[in-house]
Amino acid sequence: MSSAKEQSSVTAALQPEQWTTSSNEALKLFVTNPEAALNFQPTFTYPIFGDAETIYGYKDLDIFLCFDHYTFKPFLNIKYSAKLTDDPEIIDIKKTIDEFLPKLTIFKDEVKWVDSIKEEKDNGYKIPGKLIGSFSENDKEYDIYKIDLKSDNGYELHQRLQILVLLFIEAGSFIDAKDELWNLYVLYEKDNKSTSNNESSIVGFTTAYNYWKYPGAKKFDSTEQELRIKISQFIILPIYQGQGLGQLFYSHLFDKWLAQDDIIEVVVEDPNESFDDLRDRADLKRLNTSEQFDFKAVTPKVDKEWVEKTRRAIKLEKRQFARLLEIILLYKLKHGYPGITKRDVRLFIKKRLYDKNKEGLATLDDNTKKDKLQTAYQALEDDYYRILGDLKLNIKRGNDEEETDTVSKKQKV
């Protein structure tokens, strides 16, 4: 027995790659429903297994982390063909993952997991929150719930969901769900099949924080409350991505916040590129139908008072509203709207870029400064055109006629 251990130790020392596994590949995620177990892979595992995202000391390693589609109760199982036992660098995988999972997670015993889910449902498990919105897409129906984090079931649901933040959001971290200023919104796909269980499936979720905003001395003593909503985490499960559901989820939440008088601004905490894209397109579509937004007013000489008044009315933060105005200007330029020149649009966008980076540019000579600004502008212009894609906006032309299909097919400038 000892000789076998010694042999494996020698092999590990000489061929460590045989005992090293990518944690991104080893960890296999599943959402199970009555018909199937839907598999997807994590984007990141470094918050759990370290920056190298590798696990040493196991052969043929598979880590199965499964969730019920309705309650999201987790099940963990770990399988491997061999394990080194005499190396202090070898981690206890279960102990490592347990730190990020709720205490009620079932380990190894799949029958016990299935029975525990059935027991929860037999005891009357319901979505622990309030229905605040619904929509249909691709012949399917979806509900948005604001989860009651003060309730035991609401808090537990968040505990079950939160590991996904680490696995899909770079630099993501857990929130303090006991802080009453946090909100959790969960998107569900309704079960429209002719079955008796009527169980919806979790599609994604977002967390948002309520910030009190100082209203200024004149309003400070008023009883009116002014809040900023900050979207912190936003996840659509990979098995539901590519269907436009994230954009619809965001848009319906934003519409809810628009209707609340105490909310004066909606901001996003450190958005990544994919969420920026989702947000830009959703915001453009909302402006497209908004009675509070006048596309005619958007020119390179746009009135500053109109900008601030409109931005406040539609509750967008300054950076995001500025981006939307720039995208609309490029849209007008692309489609040949009167009075919009490439030079004016370029100078308009460069001014914001300069103001944003004024401190860093101040140390550069004029030629280098111009080169830096032009490079930044060109990258931004390319990105804006990518975001626009084939999007059509209801902008009236000089003759007060809305853009036609012919105009929309003009060659990009």
Which residues does each predicted region cover?
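Conserved acetyl-CoA binding element of GNAT-fold acetyltransferases
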Residues: 227-238
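Conserved acetyl-CoA-binding loop-helix of GNAT-fold acetyltransferases
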Residues: 236, 242-255
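Non-catalytic substrate-recognition and accessory regions of acyl/acetyltransferase enzymes
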Residues: 1-229, 255, 260-269, 273-275, ...
